[in-house]
A protein has these predicted regions:
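Adenine nucleotide-associated cytosolic modules
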Residues: 1-161
Length: 161
């Protein structure tokens, strides 16, 4: 990557980020990509991105289903991850390690995340902000649904201030 653009700096981290360490890394980033497989991590990353107004490119895959979205609170109408999946809601935690995931699906979702991140960094095209892109890996069909901001959201709504 440095050969293509010497101004790009990629810093790989081989550690679990929590608390202050997570906050510091999110604050220093231009774009955050979340590829985690559990809600508590996704919510922690979302809170840090919301706090520091950093765009979050979220991707997930389980069994034969995948999803990608961008949560960019620099845009006033953009929802955050918590607007879509409220923390503390009785959402069934289904982990890849237990349920499995169709291996090519992770590559497809990851590629879509990379494309969204590059568009955000380059400032080109239309991001997935405000939309959730869903992939049915068995039918090999993509569909997009509109996402709305939750006015009662405890992370990005008026109650969060």
């Amino acid at each position: 990557l440095a050969l293509l653009n010497p101004d790009v700096q990629v810093i790989p981290l081989e550690q679990r980020l929590e608390g202050v360490a997570l906050e510091d890394q999110v604050a220093a980033a231009d774009v955050v990509l979340d590829c985690s497989d559990n809600f508590s991590t996704r919510h922690a990353i979302n809170r840090a991105c919301a706090k520091h107004h950093k765009p979050l490119v979220s991707g997930a895959a389980i069994r034969f289903d995948g999803q990608v979205s961008v949560f960019d609170l620099r845009q006033p109408a953009s929802p955050c991850y918590n607007c879509l999946f409220p923390e503390g809601q009785d959402t069934e935690e289904v982990r890849c390690a237990v349920m499995g995931v169709f291996a090519p699906l992770t590559g497809m979702i990851g590629t879509a995340q990379a494309a969204e991140a590059l568009k955000l960094v380059a400032g080109c095209g239309e991001s997935l902000s405000g939309r959730l892109l869903l992939l049915d890996g068995l039918a090999m069909e993509w569909r997009s649904i509109q996402l709305g901001k939750d006015p009662g959201c405890t992370v990005c709504g008026p109650a969060s201030c």
